[in-house]
Amino acid sequence: MAAKHVIYGEEARAKLKAGVDKLANAVKVTLGPKGREVIIEKKWGVPVVTKDGVTVAKEIELKDQFENIGAQLVKEVASKTADVAGDGTTTATVLAQAIFTEGLKAIASGANPMDLKRGIDEAVALVIEEVKKASIPVTSNKEIEQVATISANNDPVIGKLLAEAMEKVGKDGVITVEESKSSETTLETVQGMQFDRGYLSPYFITDADKMQAVLENPYILIFEKKISNIKELLPVLENVVRVGRSLVIIAEDVEAEALATLVVNTLKGVIRAVAVKAPGFGQRRKDYLEDIAILTGGQAITEDLGIKLESVTLDMLGQAEKVIVDKENTTIVGGKGDKKKVEARIEQIKKQIKETTSDYDREKLQERLAKLSGGVAIIRVGAATESELKEKKARVEDAVHATKAAAEEGIVAGGGTALAKASRVLENYTSANKDRELGVKIVYNACKYPLKQIAYNAGYEGSLVLEKVYEDQDKNYGFDAANGEYKDMVKAGIIDPTKVVRTALQNAASAAGTMLTAEALIAELPEKKEKTPTPTDMPPDFD
């Protein structure tokens, strides 16, 4: 076991702060409509130019191990916020830095870290309650377009496309983002569906950046039972390899021996495959598998048919243009089933919905109907250069998440307004425990930081802007940094999804609280490498 280096107390917190500041100072310049660009050097290829906070955060690794702990904790805040809400990564980073910096000052003046954390947690709960009260449900297509435009760094073309995509596939529909072969950004709707089951092994991953297994033009084996014996599966695998295609296996389970063989052959490049558990249970699983079979033009191999796995032929397998599998979901894009059969299946489910007397059954049938009829919207992102394409694609992916978040929990005034106004609930907070009160005060001040930073990035004096916005009693009155005007943010279409604001504050406070209550840091000592002697190190020749 390698030797470790341990530091404590004040020294540990100072190192954490140095790491937090290095990461946060690079990320926060991207905040707002006038956020600055960050240029990231790449070992291969051209540098990446981005205004996406999470992209900047992911690139930062610090040489000092203890500083790096602080940077990685804040990076986790940005990543978690992006995963859950799709946006708000920079806001979360700014909040984490603000809470941690203010908290350190309090600890230096003698405050108890645990009481501070309790105060911070209480304040966050109160502010989130206020944000929820101010939330406006998203109903119109215009509002969806506004959210998408802001999330895509104020790109109205992307906003319009996303609103159109959501109109076609519904709020719960599947929207995927791909790279276009031309410089145009286009929208297409195809047959497809998504279900909540992920890959059975991470070794199937083909895209390490997104942690996804992406298979182009695969065959799809739809099997009702467990696959435990690899011998049963071999004929299918051999047939698929022979035609040079990839394979998606959807089954009740793929057990140890069969899964191990599949993984080994995938890693060796013998076959491109991914195994996924079938969705649902009992009769519902059969129904789901039948839906997938009709959508992909295959056959659900169930017990009732009396077909053994080893006798399955290629014409019994489903097909699709693409299948994307991540840790939690499987998305079938462009199922190659007969459209008439898909429509007949949809009509059959609609009839069952009308006839059922059980609310639970009706809910599950409606779920199946939405999956089967919604289809999949594909946004193909185009750009003139490779670096622009990557940056634009990341923005579109953020916008997809944020737009869905808005449909889920509603919207609030954007531009940092919602948090600044919600912090009013903490203005007159008092407690018998003064350190706890101090924790609440820290969140009260931190909630105003995003608004100040947005104004500062746009070239305005943050404190003056904050003062004017905060004093106005209208919950939607804020500062439009793009035009340098004070206005009703919701009417102007400057809005944030409530889920984004909530998630950013919760994640930031959680990470900052963890760092404030940390009393020791442990890191591995770097190994000293033996210096290889060079000709200049040789002893002199005494001949």
From Swiss-Prot:
Keywords assigned by UniProt, alphabetized: ATP-binding, Chaperone, Cytoplasm, Isomerase, Nucleotide-binding
Annotated protein name in UniProt: Chaperonin GroEL
Classification via PROSITE patterns: CHAPERONINS_CPN60
Gene Ontology terms: biological process: protein refolding
GO-annotated cellular components: cytoplasm
Record field: catalytic activity: ATP + H2O + a folded polypeptide = ADP + phosphate + an unfolded polypeptide
EC number: 5.6.1.7
Cellular compartment(s): Cytoplasm
Family membership: Belongs to the chaperonin (HSP60) family.
Residues involved in ATP binding: 30-33, 51, 87-91, 415, 480-482, 496
GO molecular function, one term: isomerase activity
Organism of this sequence: Hydrogenobaculum sp. (strain Y04AAS1)
Function according to Swiss-Prot or TrEMBL: Together with its co-chaperonin GroES, plays an essential role in assisting protein folding. The GroEL-GroES system forms a nano-cage that allows encapsulation of the non-native substrate proteins and provides a physical environment optimized to promote and accelerate protein folding.
